[in-house]
Amino acid sequence: MNDNQLAPVARPRSPLELLDTVPDSLLRRLKQYSGRLATEAVSAMQERLPFFADLEASQRASVALVVQTAVVNFVEWMHDPHSDVGYTAQAFELVPQDLTRRIALRQTVDMVRVTMEFFEEVVPLLARSEEQLTALTVGILKYSRDLAFTAATAYADAAEARGTWDSRMEASVVDAVVRGDTGPELLSRAAALNWDTTAPATVLVGTPAPGPNGSNSDGDSERASQDVRDTAARHGRAALTDVHGTWLVAIVSGQLSPTEKFLKDLLAAFADAPVVIGPTAPMLTAAHRSASEAISGMNAVAGWRGAPRPVLARELLPERALMGDASAIVALHTDVMRPLADAGPTLIETLDAYLDCGGAIEACARKLFVHPNTVRYRLKRITDFTGRDPTQPRDAYVLRVAATVGQLNYPTPH
């Protein structure tokens, strides 16, 4: 046995070890060709990505700057492959905010992919040995991974910032509608939130649905707001929401029908408690009335134990009037008492007698010295004029409060 047979066989170095020992000559070549690599990478984007040509000149320049910075950072990173991704992150810190808004995340991924594919094709040509080729290949793969994650982080941060800004703008729009501030800024802000400014608007008010554990945190309220938006989107509607105190105020486009599936799905975002719907406004700038009536209804709905869910604010006129809601008092006067007064004193007299007799037609007829059929005819006429049937308990209550309000001479606008 000779001495050569006893000599240990040299272990080949791993790719990571090769990456740690890149010769200075290779690093100098990388730096020398960095400008050319960046320019040709942008040219590759123009050839392989159809959307790139549609970007404005300033946006293409921003992309070129990012690529140039990424190439320079790659050269610096190759000096110390164990360093963090700070060099890589610097490339995306240069991206203007308007560019992150105009270029979708998928397009950014495509640009990163094309750039790194180009690097994989060209950079290895700078190698002068198999070891250098391996080191460059491993370096590109590791660097491209960091670059991809950083791109995703940049867009996630931008999306989060936009989401926060959109939430604040949405809250300001809802607050403006509630306060009746219908200045020109209202429509511009709503339009920025993809609201059709010519669409009718209906306001709902209720308590946001609690969390899975029955909690009522800010996060649960935001989840309920998002549920309203998602439900509206599924049904081809738009929605603006905000939490005012303990109530969730939602403005949805279009009218709401009690039998509509959209309304049923919408109620899932609210707690199992009263939900009040205001009247539909012709457009967003006129939605203050819908909001004020819905909020007034929420304040008064406890007065009607059997109130349906949801309940129209207009069905809560008696309770709202008893709480001093001027608009409810006006509605009772204009929709109930004025039509009866215009028809002559007979119908009001019959209504008072019928209600005083506890809804007994025979007793009412005796009190008025008329035939019971005359009372029935007059009650039908009252229904025709007011839309309220005195023989139905809830309508009778509405008519009673309306008559009381009329007798108390509440001031009403002319």
Curated annotation (Swiss-Prot):
InterPro entries: CdaR-like_regulators, CdaR_GGDEF, PucR_C-HTH_dom, PucR_C-HTH_sf. This is Uncharacterized protein Rv2242. It comes from the Bacteria. Residues 204-230 are annotated as: Disordered. One of its GO terms (biological process) is positive regulation of DNA-templated transcription. PANTHER family: CARBOHYDRATE DIACID REGULATOR, PUCR FAMILY TRANSCRIPTIONAL REGULATOR. Residues 220-230 have a biased composition (Basic and acidic residues). It comes from Mycobacterium tuberculosis (strain ATCC 25618 / H37Rv). Belongs to the CdaR family. GO terms for molecular function: DNA-binding transcription factor activity.
